[in-house]
Curated annotation (Swiss-Prot):
Its cofactor is heme. This is Carnosic acid synthase. SUPFAM superfamilies: Cytochrome P450 (SSF48264). It catalyses: 11-hydroxyferruginol + 3 reduced [NADPH--hemoprotein reductase] + 3 O2 = carnosate + 3 oxidized [NADPH--hemoprotein reductase] + 4 H2O + 4 H(+); miltiradiene + 2 reduced [NADPH--hemoprotein reductase] + 2 O2 = miltiradien-20-al + 2 oxidized [NADPH--hemoprotein reductase] + 3 H2O + 2 H(+); ferruginol + 3 reduced [NADPH--hemoprotein reductase] + 3 O2 = pisiferate + 3 oxidized [NADPH--hemoprotein reductase] + 4 H2O + 4 H(+). It comes from Salvia pomifera (Apple sage). Pathway: Secondary metabolite biosynthesis; terpenoid biosynthesis. Monooxygenase involved in the biosynthesis of carnosate, a potent antioxidant labdane-related diterpene natural product. Catalyzes the oxidation of 11-hydroxyferruginol to produce carnosate. Mediates the conversion of miltiradien into miltiradien-20-al. Also involved in the production of pisiferic acid and derivative products from ferruginol. The gene is CYP76AK6.
Length: 500
């Protein structure tokens, strides 16, 4: 159905935009990176398929690590090697520091204040990014909030211990991360585990909103390829995102208003959370910070923090259950270091090299964002001898880099051992492993995500033995994914925990 809509709209668009069918800047094809042949009007759109990260990886085998495509009216360059990723994110980082903002998310004023959508040269971006980096994700800030994370891990272990049969692992990790973000930001919890009688309609709606936002933001949008159709919202993405993002903004707005009213009371005692600190900053002289900026920042943090770490932990459990020998190695290491403690402390992580290797291998094998957030060229520049015109959209295919046999031995195999006794990490300096990006736009929440990934995987593996639900043992079935802003499992992992 989507293909028919696409072709019909492309035919209509041809009547309006045919006059502009030429290469960017009028240059000859020889100046631009190589790429596959294009159909009239729609270009290479049909070659993306349902899994663009895999389709682009296949095309890169023919056209190389710097490949050009035409997606409707958009000129796109796809980066598929560590060397070219370094050129884009580091050497030419300022030129490519502007994010591509899909038309469907240019709603509710979000694009005007969201640190995910503003260029790195924006004063607002610099201000909000600095606040997040220093006040929430710095080592000092994270040390101060370690008890909040420890309590969420305890609740996760308690919930799994209560399960008498197969449980939805991804739902449990999502609940853990969502509650962590709300406890850190607002000193409240928003969701309950599946066995709770208090799982209200509001809680279910919250899950629906976050899942819908990450799903719809990853859907290729005809209105982006042919901006002439933007007012008509042909796929309904703008309408859907307005509802789901608007609902989250309303939820956060209500929490902020409650706090503002409480702060006016003579008997008010300050909360030890991020919102309290932000409101204090908004009333001081150091930052010109508005309540509207606080609201949109909190929504950005909730969406990013709730979804990707939860999905990556679910993928980790998938691979460990499919590889019992790897799970046994991890459990033995945890037993030798942690002993009989049920909760793994963040200070234990540095003593657990196989746990660290397992997390790295999961991030390689199942990168949370298979295509890193796309960038735009602020000006014409050169990469590897090719012209990259101004306003070119840049995709970095992290999935391709992570599966490249010239970089990784046996890339299609899950082998944590490949990361033992080497210094490769995912902090943005080793471009063969950049699941969180690199350079100016590296994910600011990386330090928090790293702590929670290690601790959630360790908590689930140390306290329990696991069995896959009967009938779900197929590796092919378990590894099926759904493309989006985050790479989700197509079928949720259901597994049976057995208390050790």
């Amino acid at each position: 159905m989507q293909v028919l809509i696409l072709l019909s709209l492309a035919f209509l668009a041809s009547c309006v935009v045919a006059y502009s069918r030429r290469r960017p800047g009028g240059r000859g094809a020889g100046d631009l990176p190589p790429g596959p042949p294009r159909l009239p009007i729609i270009g290479n759109m049909l070659q993306l398929g349902q899994n663009p990260h895999k389709s682009l990886a296949h095309l890169a085998k023919t056209y190389g690590p710097l490949m050009s495509l035409k997606l409707g009216n958009q000129f796109v360059v796809v980066v598929s090697s560590p060397e070219m990723a370094r050129e884009v994110l580091q050497r030419h980082g300022l030129v490519f520091s502007r994010p591509f903002t899909p038309i469907a998310v240019q709603i509710l004023g979000h694009g005007e204040v969201s640190m995910n959508m503003l260029p790195a040269t924006s004063p607002i971006w610099k201000k909000i990014r600095k606040i997040a980096r220093e006040k929430l994700f710095s080592n000092q800030a994270l040390h101060a909030t370690r008890a909040v994370r420890r309590e969420r891990l305890r609740k996760l272990a308690d919930y799994v211990g209560r399960c008498s049969g197969a449980m939805n692992v991804g739902e449990a990790t999502f609940t853990t991360m969502s509650n962590l973000m709300f406890a850190t930001l607002f000193s409240v919890e928003i969701t309950q585990y599946a066995d709770s009688d208090s799982d209200s309609g509001v809680n279910k709606k919250f899950r629906e909103h976050v899942n819908a936002i990450t799903r719809y933001m990853g859907v290729p949008n005809i209105a982006d390829f042919f901006p002439i159709f933007a007012p008509f919202d042909p796929q309904g993405l703008r309408r859907k995102l307005t509802y789901h993002l608007g609902s989250l903004l309303e939820l956060v707005q209500s929490l902020i208003e409650q706090r503002l009213r409480a702060r006016n009371a003579a008997t008010y005692r300050k909360k030890d959370d991020f919102l309290e600190m932000l409101l204090d900053l908004s009333e001081g002289d150091e930052y010109d910070l508005s309540v509207n900026e606080i609201k949109h920042l909190c929504v950005d943090l909730i969406i990013a923090g709730s979804d990707t770490s939860a999905a990556t932990t679910e993928w980790a459990m998938v691979e460990l259950l499919l590889h019992p020998d790897k799970l046994a190695k991890l459990k033995a290491e945890l037993k030798s270091v942690v002993g009989d403690k049920s909760i793994i402390e963040e200070s234990d992580i540095s003593k657990l090299p196989y746990l660290q290797a397992t997390v790295k291998e999961v991030l390689r094998y199942h990168p949370a964002a298979p295509l890193l957030a796309p960038h735009l060229a602020e000006e014409e520049t050169q990469l590897n001898g090719y012209i990259i015109p101004k306003n070119t959209k840049i995709f970095i295919n992290d999935w391709t880099i992570s599966r490249d046999p010239s970089i990784w031995k046996n890339p299609e195999m899950f082998e944590p051992e490949r990361f033992l006794n080497n210094d490769i990490d995912f902090c943005g300096q080793h471009f063969e492993l950049i699941p969180f990006g690199s350079g100016r736009r590296i994910c600011p929440g990386l330090p928090l995500a790293s702590r929670m990934l290690h601790c959630m995987v360790a908590t689930l593996c140390h306290n329990f033995d696991w069995e896959l639900e009967k009938g779900t043992e197929s590796k092919q079935l378990q590894r099926e994914d759904v493309f989006g802003l985050a790479l989700q499992k197509k079928i949720p992992l259901r597994a049976i925990p057995i208390k050790v």
